[in-house]
């Protein structure tokens, strides 16, 4: 949609023209905000800005520049949910799970706030998020018809808070084998090991951030193989694990760390 250009001559600055000028200016900003969003995606569902190509490994490794700011005991994250969703309750439940188990507090966005996350859906937009806090509006794509699931909402929010996928942890080779011969060539970068801050927590096969064993397979064979006997199942988490919650509390230095069982979360949110 194109906005016509309004030319104000210096001798015709009537209140009516000034009002029309500012109306068109604000309308153009709103249309830009909700215009079609196309972002390069790293690690399957992690978006990176065209200008910086920043990803989250340095964020959680250095804890500088990627965390949302803390005010007192809490970390307030403003959010906006597109009215295109009929499933807003699922997104709200996902955010509420952080309010219940961590010091993260999701609060409705108001226009005076510059930094916030915005959940949106577009045809073929898929599921993705930025890694760590960005400046200004920070989009989280949850395409209707496939991405608006409780576990996916938690997964993408964890990216926005600064967390990477489990299977790219710096110590992953002790727990899994990455079968590169079975991975689509253009997707192999998704499995490269990264420098991560593991926050003194163990590798977690039950993490909501773990890929499943056939992720990006080119031939129907596994791309990730768990070590151990018996080999643990992984990649189909219905929600955040206990370790996922503990990591958020540690990274953001929440004052009272608690252990939340999977049973508690299932009873609370199913």
Regions found by a protein language model. Give the residues of each.
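Zinc-dependent metalloendopeptidases
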Residues: 1-17, 26-270
């Amino acid at each position: 949609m194109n906005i016509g250009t309004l030319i104000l001559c210096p001798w015709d600055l009537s209140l009516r023209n000034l009002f029309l000028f500012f109306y068109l200016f604000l309308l153009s900003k709103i249309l830009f905000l909700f215009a079609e969003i196309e972002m390069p995606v790293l690690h399957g569902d992690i978006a990176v800005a065209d200008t910086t190509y920043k990803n989250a490994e340095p964020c959680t490794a250095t804890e500088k520049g990627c965390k949302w700011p803390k005010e007192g005991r809490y970390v307030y994250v403003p959010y906006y949910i597109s009215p295109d969703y009929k499933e807003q309750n699922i997104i709200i439940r996902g955010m509420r799970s952080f309010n219940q188990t961590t010091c993260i507090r999701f609060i409705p966005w108001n226009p005076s706030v510059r930094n916030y996350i915005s959940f949106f859906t577009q045809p073929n937009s898929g599921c993705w998020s930025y890694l760590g806090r960005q400046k200004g509006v920070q989009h989280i794509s949850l395409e209707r018809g496939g991405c608006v699931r409780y576990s996916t909402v938690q997964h993408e929010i964890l990216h926005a808070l600064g967390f990477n996928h489990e299977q790219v942890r710096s110590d992953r080779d002790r727990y899994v084998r990455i079968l590169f011969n079975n991975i689509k060539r253009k997707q192999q970068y998704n499995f490269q090991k990264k420098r991560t801050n593991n926050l003194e927590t163990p590798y977690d096969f039950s993490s909501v951030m773990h890929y499943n064993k056939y992720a990006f397979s080119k031939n129907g064979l596994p791309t990730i193989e768990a070590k151990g006997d018996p080999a643990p199942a992984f990649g189909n988490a219905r929600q955040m694990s206990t370790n996922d919650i503990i990591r958020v509390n540690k990274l953001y230095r929440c004052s009272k760390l608690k252990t939340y069982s999977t049973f508690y979360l299932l009873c609370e949110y199913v």
